């Protein structure tokens, strides 16, 4: 079963959207196997966004992601990386398809509510960055027997 990392960013947490976003994900049949509300410090933010070091928007990105709490999650399911990315929608909420999380909740490209891993490699790296192995649970959902 594939796993991915998804994070409700500070703007989503501050606007009280965690529950709605998690509900949307779970209604799709995706399993939440880890989740925690946390404050990201600069060191962790720089590790997470290492590929953007040196880019003009880097300092603003670090400032934003450390500005308030985030809700970090590990999701599990068949093709969960692709499915979660499709559910999130395009980075720019004005270009996101109707019904996607960003189309419904994001206000601006720089305040787009949610982050999700874009590949199996980034998912593995981000999960290891934000979670200890013992924090990721294995369980069966009642609906699993029907799928």
UniProtKB/Swiss-Prot annotation:
Subcellular location: Cytoplasm
Reaction catalysed by this enzyme: a 2'-deoxyribonucleoside 5'-diphosphate + ATP = a 2'-deoxyribonucleoside 5'-triphosphate + ADP; a ribonucleoside 5'-diphosphate + ATP = a ribonucleoside 5'-triphosphate + ADP
Keywords noted in UniProt: ATP-binding, Cytoplasm, Kinase, Magnesium, Metal-binding, Nucleotide metabolism, Nucleotide-binding, Phosphoprotein, Transferase
List of catalytic residues: 115
Protein function: Major role in the synthesis of nucleoside triphosphates other than ATP. The ATP gamma phosphate is transferred to the NDP beta phosphate via a ping-pong mechanism, using a phosphorylated active-site intermediate.
The protein's name: Nucleoside diphosphate kinase
Predominant cellular place of this UniProt entry's protein: cytoplasm
Lineage per the UniProt record: Bacteria, Bacillati, Bacillota, Bacilli, Bacillales
């Amino acid at each position: 079963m594939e796993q991915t990392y998804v994070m409700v960013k500070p703007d989503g947490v501050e606007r009280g959207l965690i529950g709605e976003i998690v509900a949307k994900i779970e209604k799709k049949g995706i399993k939440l196997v880890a989740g925690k509300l946390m404050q990201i410090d600069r060191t962790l933010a720089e590790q997470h966004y290492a590929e953007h070091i040196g880019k003009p928007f880097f300092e603003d990105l670090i400032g934003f992601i450390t500005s308030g709490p985030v809700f970090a999650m590990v999701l599990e399911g068949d093709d969960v990386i692709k499915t979660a990315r499709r559910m999130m929608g395009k980075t720019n909420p004005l270009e996101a398809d109707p019904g996607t999380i960003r189309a419904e909740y994001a206000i601006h490209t720089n305040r787009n509510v949610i982050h999700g891993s874009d590949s199996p490699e980034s998912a593995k790296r981000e999960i290891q960055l934000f979670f200890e192995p013992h924090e990721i649970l294995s369980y069966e959902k009642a609906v699993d027997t029907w799928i």
